[in-house]
Amino acid sequence: MKVIVVKNQLEGGKIGLDLLKKSMANGAKTLGLATGSTPVEFYNQIVNSDLDFTDMVSVNLDEYVGLDGSNDQSYRYFMTKHLFGEKPFKENFLPNGKAADLEAEAKHYDQIIEENPIDWQILGIGQNGHIGFNEPGTPAEITTHVVDLQESTIKANARFFESEADVPRKAISMGLASIMKSKNIVLMAYGKEKAEAIKGMVEGEVTTELPASILQNHANVTVIADEAAVSLLSK
């Protein structure tokens, strides 16, 4: 696991863009994408670049249950706003949070990932160590699944909604086993509130209680983080 320390999200976004360019030059065709505040500057860098994605496929990590793509808090809306609206792809896949049969939708999404193996996956990390919506206690072998969001995640995401009561309680998320199949993983983290999770992920034992720690078992992980996020690392 390689750790790159940056001054801020702007520098992190630029480094992320450079890593993506190298991966695309080496033939990457499928990108795994994340949402939330962490990758926004990275997406800004992509939008302002000359990269062409018209022959590329994207596969997103997750989506809230109950929100359709027109809802401004859905992850499809987020991706359209920050990336897809400016940089067209050959195809964009996200879980359908409005599916009548959520378990069937999870199986369908696994099939999409099987048909579009992820070459380059971007991740954020939650304060509790979640990646995607894989909360503490999630089995390592799980693929796409329906998740009951933990209270800490609901509280962390409440700032995006009118009130905490409006935050969806469930999501469909790519599983840890799905994420681990990605050829290359780049995880971004900014701010002191991520320091405990980063320490556990990089230096702690691999445990389901800190889902991101499973990344220690992946051969190609790069962490892009600011000084605050790496402040608890011993090396």
Swiss-Prot record:
Q: Name one GO biological process term.
A: N-acetylglucosamine catabolic process
User: Where, by residue number, is the active site?
Assistant: D62, N128, H130, E135
Which reaction is the catalytic activity of this chain? alpha-D-glucosamine 6-phosphate + H2O = beta-D-fructose 6-phosphate + NH4(+)
**Residue intervals passing through the bilayer:** none
Q: What GO cellular component entries does it have?
A: cytoplasm
Top class in the EC scheme: hydrolase
Give the E.C. number(s).
Answer: 3.5.99.6
Q: What is the recorded function of this protein according to its Swiss-Prot or TrEMBL entry?
A: Catalyzes the reversible isomerization-deamination of glucosamine 6-phosphate (GlcN6P) to form fructose 6-phosphate (Fru6P) and ammonium ion.
Q: What is this protein called?
A: Glucosamine-6-phosphate deaminase
Write down the species: Lactococcus lactis subsp. lactis (strain IL1403) (Streptococcus lactis)
Task: Give the lineage.
Answer: Bacteria, Bacillati, Bacillota, Bacilli, Lactobacillales
Gene encoding it? nagB
